[in-house]
């Protein structure tokens, strides 16, 4: 019997592919990433690969929003907040950008696994 392998970046909340109940943990995690309204859409709830695709696109949209926030922060916020607040907002966006990069990798790995990919240990 082979041991389940997960690559770096695999979400700790999701059991390894092939482990008992792994898809249930994947669905729960993916739904937590998405807007709450997604839980009420039967097409997404019944088809885990579709849910994974929705989650990927949602995370990518969040990344785009963060990048836009970063690019516009100084010009858009300078008239409504002090320099210290603007700099704090930029730091927050940078932190969120880093977090979302990891989430994007994780959600992509889960999507690949739901599509049938199995990961192999490499030396």
Give the label of every model feature segment.
Residues 17-123:
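Eukaryotic low-complexity, intrinsically disordered regulatory segments enriched in serine, proline
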């Amino acid at each position: 019997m082979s041991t389940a392998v997960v690559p770096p970046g695999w979400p700790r909340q999701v059991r390894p592919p092939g482990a008992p109940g792994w898809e249930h943990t994947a669905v729960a995690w993916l739904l937590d990433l998405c807007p709450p309204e997604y839980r009420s859409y039967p097409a997404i709830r019944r088809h885990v690969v579709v849910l994974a695709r929705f989650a990927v696109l949602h995370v990518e949209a969040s990344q785009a929003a963060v990048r836009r926030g970063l690019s516009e922060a100084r010009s858009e916020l300078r008239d409504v907040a002090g320099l210290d607040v603007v700099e704090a907002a930029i730091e927050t966006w940078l932190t969120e950008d880093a977090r979302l990069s990891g989430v994007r990798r994780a959600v992509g790995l889960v999507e690949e696994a739901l599509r049938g990919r199995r990961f192999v240990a490499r030396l």
